[in-house]
């Protein structure tokens, strides 16, 4: 049986909610991508976070990751993130640059406020051509906050 890991990056906690649900339903291990410099998780400061995210994207920054994640020990890796400026946060580029996904199965999921996956699943396929990238799960932010169990269950069944 394939060893599974759910890896996620989340500032406001919505991607974390989905990640925890996936781990619960699959029995996968779970790990958070933690930035060296934490992002402000106060939703009242959303505009400041949005400006920072845009600046990172425009300047092609690669925020550093604080923790190590043992990707090599896993065959199937669920990777989750919020959408920022219609793409994934730049720390995900750091993550894909840092680890070798050759021969792995990547299963993306994301939270959003109306942009779906924004083409990020195709971006992952381009960044990781030696991995197999399966159909992802875009979850609208309010659906994540209200409980994604049914959507996750349906999606997981579609993968098998």
Give the residues covered by each predicted segment.
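N-terminal beta1-alpha1-beta2 submodule of the flavodoxin-like/Rossmannoid cofactor-binding fold
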Residues: 1-79, 86-88, 93, 97, ...
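Extracytoplasmic/periplasmic soluble domains downstream of a signal peptide or transmembrane helix
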Residues: 3-4, 31, 119-121, 134
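Structural beta-sheet core signal
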Residues: 6, 79, 108-110, 135
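Residue-level recognition of beta-strand->loop/alpha-helix junctions
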Residues: 32-34, 110, 137-138
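Short, conserved loop/helix-junction motifs that constitute active-site signature segments
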Residues: 71-72, 97-103, 126-129
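Short beta-alpha junction loops
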Residues: 110-115, 141
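Glycine-rich, charge-decorated loop segments at or immediately adjacent to ligand/cofactor-binding or catalytic sites
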Residues: 114-127
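Glycine-rich phosphate/pyrophosphate-binding loop and the adjoining helix
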Residues: 132-160
């Amino acid at each position: 049986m394939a060893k599974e890991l759910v890896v996620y990056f989340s500032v406001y906690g919505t991607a974390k909610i989905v990640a925890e649900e996936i781990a619960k339903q699959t029995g996968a291990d779970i790990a958070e991508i933690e930035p060296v410099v934490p992002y402000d998780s106060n939703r009242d400061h959303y505009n400041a976070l949005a400006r920072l995210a845009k600046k990172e994207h425009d300047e092609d920054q690669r925020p550093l990751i604080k923790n190590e994640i043992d990707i090599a020990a896993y065959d199937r890796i669920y990777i989750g993130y919020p959408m920022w400026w219609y793409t994934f946060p730049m720390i995900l580029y750091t993550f894909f640059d840092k680890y070798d996904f050759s021969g792995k199965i990547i299963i993306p999921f994301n939270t959003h406020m109306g942009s779906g996956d924004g083409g990020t699943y195709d971006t992952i396929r381009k960044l990781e051509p030696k991995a197999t990238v399966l159909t992802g799960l875009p979850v609208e932010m309010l659906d994540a906050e209200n409980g994604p169990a049914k959507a996750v269950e349906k999606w997981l069944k579609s993968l098998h």
